[in-house]
Protein backbone atom coordinates (compact mmCIF):
# COMPACT_ATOMS: atom_id res chain seq x y z
CA UNK A 1 0.00 0.00 0.00
CA UNK A 2 1.26 3.48 -0.87
CA UNK A 3 1.54 6.26 1.70
CA UNK A 4 -1.62 8.35 1.50
CA UNK A 5 -2.52 11.72 3.05
CA UNK A 6 -6.29 11.33 2.71
CA UNK A 7 -8.84 11.13 5.54
CA UNK A 8 -10.93 8.38 3.92
CA UNK A 9 -9.31 5.72 6.11
CA UNK A 10 -10.16 7.54 9.35
CA UNK A 11 -13.20 6.71 11.48
CA UNK A 12 -16.11 9.11 11.77
CA UNK A 13 -16.46 11.49 14.74
CA UNK A 14 -19.05 9.06 16.15
CA UNK A 15 -16.54 6.19 16.01
CA UNK A 16 -18.18 4.41 13.08
CA UNK A 17 -16.14 3.09 10.15
CA UNK A 18 -16.21 4.77 6.75
CA UNK A 19 -16.75 2.88 3.55
CA UNK A 20 -14.15 3.59 0.85
CA UNK A 21 -15.80 5.50 -1.99
CA UNK A 22 -12.87 5.58 -4.39
CA UNK A 23 -9.30 4.49 -4.96
CA UNK A 24 -6.32 6.55 -3.82
CA UNK A 25 -5.56 9.64 -5.86
CA UNK A 26 -2.22 11.03 -7.00
CA UNK A 27 -2.84 14.35 -5.22
CA UNK A 28 -3.21 12.52 -1.89
CA UNK A 29 0.17 10.81 -2.02
CA UNK A 30 2.71 10.93 0.78
CA UNK A 31 6.42 10.06 0.65
CA UNK A 32 8.65 8.20 3.10
CA UNK A 33 10.66 10.35 5.55
CA UNK A 34 14.15 11.39 4.46
CA UNK A 35 15.75 10.59 7.85
CA UNK A 36 18.77 12.75 7.00
CA UNK A 37 21.92 11.31 8.59
CA UNK A 38 25.30 12.82 9.44
CA UNK A 39 27.82 12.14 6.67
CA UNK A 40 29.30 13.43 3.42
CA UNK A 41 26.56 15.31 1.55
CA UNK A 42 24.06 13.39 -0.52
CA UNK A 43 20.98 15.24 -1.79
CA UNK A 44 18.31 13.85 -4.14
CA UNK A 45 15.90 15.82 -6.30
CA UNK A 46 12.24 14.85 -5.99
CA UNK A 47 9.64 15.89 -8.55
CA UNK A 48 6.49 17.17 -6.85
CA UNK A 49 3.03 18.33 -7.86
CA UNK A 50 3.01 21.02 -10.53
CA UNK A 51 6.45 20.04 -11.83
CA UNK A 52 8.14 21.66 -8.83
CA UNK A 53 11.07 20.04 -7.07
CA UNK A 54 12.04 19.31 -3.50
CA UNK A 55 15.57 18.61 -2.36
CA UNK A 56 15.67 15.51 -0.22
CA UNK A 57 18.89 15.46 1.85
CA UNK A 58 19.89 11.90 2.75
CA UNK A 59 23.25 12.83 4.28
CA UNK A 60 24.65 16.19 5.36
CA UNK A 61 27.73 17.28 7.30
CA UNK A 62 27.74 21.09 7.00
CA UNK A 63 25.26 23.90 7.44
CA UNK A 64 24.96 27.66 7.52
CA UNK A 65 24.51 28.80 11.13
CA UNK A 66 23.64 32.28 12.38
CA UNK A 67 25.01 33.97 15.48
CA UNK A 68 21.97 36.15 16.09
CA UNK A 69 23.32 38.50 18.76
CA UNK A 70 26.30 39.37 16.54
CA UNK A 71 24.30 39.44 13.29
CA UNK A 72 26.66 37.10 11.49
CA UNK A 73 26.34 33.70 9.81
CA UNK A 74 29.03 31.18 8.86
CA UNK A 75 29.15 27.81 7.14
CA UNK A 76 30.44 25.20 9.56
CA UNK A 77 30.67 21.47 10.20
CA UNK A 78 28.02 19.60 12.18
CA UNK A 79 29.75 17.28 14.64
CA UNK A 80 26.92 15.51 16.46
CA UNK A 81 23.21 15.41 17.31
CA UNK A 82 22.74 15.73 21.08
CA UNK A 83 19.05 16.37 21.75
CA UNK A 84 15.65 16.08 20.11
CA UNK A 85 12.47 17.04 21.94
CA UNK A 86 10.25 14.74 19.88
CA UNK A 87 12.19 11.48 19.79
CA UNK A 88 15.27 10.01 21.49
CA UNK A 89 15.65 7.54 18.64
CA UNK A 90 16.55 10.44 16.33
CA UNK A 91 19.45 11.32 18.68
CA UNK A 92 20.70 7.73 18.81
CA UNK A 93 20.67 7.40 15.01
CA UNK A 94 22.06 10.96 14.55
CA UNK A 95 19.17 12.06 12.36
CA UNK A 96 18.99 15.71 11.29
CA UNK A 97 15.48 17.17 11.42
CA UNK A 98 14.08 20.63 12.10
CA UNK A 99 14.59 21.72 15.72
CA UNK A 100 17.30 19.11 16.40
CA UNK A 101 19.93 20.35 18.84
CA UNK A 102 23.35 19.75 17.31
CA UNK A 103 26.99 20.40 18.18
CA UNK A 104 28.86 22.46 15.57
CA UNK A 105 32.48 23.48 15.03
CA UNK A 106 33.16 26.87 16.65
CA UNK A 107 36.27 27.78 14.60
CA UNK A 108 34.63 29.98 11.87
CA UNK A 109 32.80 32.03 14.51
CA UNK A 110 35.87 32.39 16.72
CA UNK A 111 37.96 33.56 13.76
CA UNK A 112 35.32 36.13 12.81
CA UNK A 113 34.98 37.40 16.40
CA UNK A 114 38.73 37.81 16.90
CA UNK A 115 39.12 39.62 13.57
CA UNK A 116 36.12 41.87 14.25
CA UNK A 117 36.79 42.82 17.88
CA UNK A 118 40.53 42.03 18.27
CA UNK A 119 39.63 40.20 21.48
CA UNK A 120 40.50 36.59 22.34
CA UNK A 121 37.58 34.16 22.44
CA UNK A 122 37.83 30.67 23.87
CA UNK A 123 41.63 30.64 23.90
CA UNK A 124 43.30 28.62 26.62
CA UNK A 125 45.62 30.79 28.67
CA UNK A 126 49.08 29.37 27.99
CA UNK A 127 52.06 31.70 28.60
CA UNK A 128 54.49 29.44 26.69
CA UNK A 129 52.25 29.54 23.64
CA UNK A 130 51.89 33.32 23.96
CA UNK A 131 55.65 33.79 23.53
CA UNK A 132 55.70 31.76 20.34
CA UNK A 133 52.77 33.61 18.75
CA UNK A 134 53.65 34.78 15.26
CA UNK A 135 53.03 38.20 13.78
CA UNK A 136 50.25 36.85 11.56
CA UNK A 137 48.05 36.31 14.60
CA UNK A 138 45.02 38.61 14.45
CA UNK A 139 45.39 39.70 18.07
CA UNK A 140 49.10 40.57 18.02
CA UNK A 141 49.20 42.12 14.54
CA UNK A 142 50.49 45.70 14.51
CA UNK A 143 47.88 48.33 13.70
CA UNK A 144 47.92 52.10 13.40
CA UNK A 145 46.49 54.23 16.20
CA UNK A 146 43.58 55.33 14.02
CA UNK A 147 42.59 51.74 13.21
CA UNK A 148 43.05 50.64 16.81
CA UNK A 149 40.70 53.41 17.94
CA UNK A 150 37.95 51.88 15.78
CA UNK A 151 38.52 48.45 17.35
CA UNK A 152 38.52 49.86 20.89
CA UNK A 153 35.14 51.46 20.17
CA UNK A 154 33.83 48.09 18.96
CA UNK A 155 35.14 46.23 21.99
CA UNK A 156 32.64 48.01 24.23
CA UNK A 157 29.90 45.89 22.64
CA UNK A 158 31.86 42.67 22.19
CA UNK A 159 30.77 40.91 25.37
CA UNK A 160 29.97 37.20 25.04
CA UNK A 161 27.88 35.48 27.73
CA UNK A 162 29.81 33.09 30.00
CA UNK A 163 27.95 29.91 29.00
CA UNK A 164 28.71 30.53 25.33
CA UNK A 165 32.33 31.47 26.01
CA UNK A 166 32.85 28.17 27.85
CA UNK A 167 31.67 26.35 24.74
CA UNK A 168 34.09 28.32 22.55
CA UNK A 169 36.91 27.13 24.82
CA UNK A 170 36.00 23.53 24.01
CA UNK A 171 35.78 24.35 20.29
CA UNK A 172 32.20 23.05 20.02
CA UNK A 173 28.99 25.05 20.34
CA UNK A 174 25.33 24.05 20.60
CA UNK A 175 23.03 25.07 17.77
CA UNK A 176 19.47 24.43 16.66
CA UNK A 177 18.51 23.41 13.12
CA UNK A 178 15.77 25.68 11.78
CA UNK A 179 15.56 24.47 8.17
CA UNK A 180 13.93 21.22 7.01
CA UNK A 181 16.68 18.98 5.56
CA UNK A 182 14.20 16.55 3.99
CA UNK A 183 12.38 19.36 2.14
CA UNK A 184 15.04 21.91 1.16
CA UNK A 185 18.18 19.77 1.27
CA UNK A 186 19.99 21.99 3.79
CA UNK A 187 20.63 21.91 7.52
CA UNK A 188 20.84 25.59 8.46
CA UNK A 189 20.17 26.98 11.91
CA UNK A 190 21.27 29.29 14.69
CA UNK A 191 23.57 29.23 17.72
CA UNK A 192 21.79 28.78 21.05
CA UNK A 193 22.07 31.74 23.41
CA UNK A 194 20.56 33.12 26.61
CA UNK A 195 17.56 31.39 28.17
CA UNK A 196 17.28 28.92 25.28
CA UNK A 197 20.87 27.75 25.76
CA UNK A 198 20.29 27.47 29.51
CA UNK A 199 17.16 25.37 28.91
CA UNK A 200 18.82 22.90 26.53
CA UNK A 201 21.98 22.57 28.64
CA UNK A 202 19.75 21.54 31.53
CA UNK A 203 17.88 19.04 29.32
CA UNK A 204 21.08 17.48 27.95
CA UNK A 205 22.57 17.24 31.46
CA UNK A 206 19.47 15.49 32.84
CA UNK A 207 19.63 12.89 30.06
CA UNK A 208 23.20 11.87 30.90
Curated annotation (Swiss-Prot):
PROSITE patterns (alphabetical): RIBOSOMAL_S8E
Topological relation to the membrane, as annotated:
Lipid-anchor
Name any GO cellular component annotation. membrane
Please give the CDD domains that the UniProt record associates with this protein: Ribosomal_S8e_like
Chief location of this protein? Answer: cytoplasm
> Which superkingdom heads the taxonomic lineage of this protein's source?
Eukaryota
- Chain intervals with Basic residues compositional bias: 8-23
Question: From the UniProt record, which GO molecular function terms apply?
Answer: structural constituent of ribosome
Which stretches of sequence are listed as region Disordered?
A: 1-23
- A biological-process GO annotation: maturation of SSU-rRNA from tricistronic rRNA transcript (SSU-rRNA, 5.8S rRNA, LSU-rRNA)
Fill in the subunit field for this protein: Component of the small ribosomal subunit. Identified in a IGF2BP1-dependent mRNP granule complex containing untranslated mRNAs. Part of the small subunit (SSU) processome, composed of more than 70 proteins and the RNA chaperone small nucleolar RNA (snoRNA) U3.
Please describe what this protein does: Component of the small ribosomal subunit. The ribosome is a large ribonucleoprotein complex responsible for the synthesis of proteins in the cell. Part of the small subunit (SSU) processome, first precursor of the small eukaryotic ribosomal subunit. During the assembly of the SSU processome in the nucleolus, many ribosome biogenesis factors, an RNA chaperone and ribosomal proteins associate with the nascent pre-rRNA and work in concert to generate RNA folding, modifications, rearrangements and cleavage as well as targeted degradation of pre-ribosomal RNA by the RNA exosome.
Entry's family note: Belongs to the eukaryotic ribosomal protein eS8 family.
In terms of PANTHER family, this protein maps to: 40S RIBOSOMAL PROTEIN S8
**Protein name per UniProt:** Small ribosomal subunit protein eS8
Amino acid sequence: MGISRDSAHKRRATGGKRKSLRKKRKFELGRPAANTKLGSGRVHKVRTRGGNTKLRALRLETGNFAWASEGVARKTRIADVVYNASNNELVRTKTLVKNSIVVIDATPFRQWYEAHYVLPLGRKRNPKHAQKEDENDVLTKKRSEKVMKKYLERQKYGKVEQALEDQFTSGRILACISSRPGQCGRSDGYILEGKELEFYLKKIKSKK
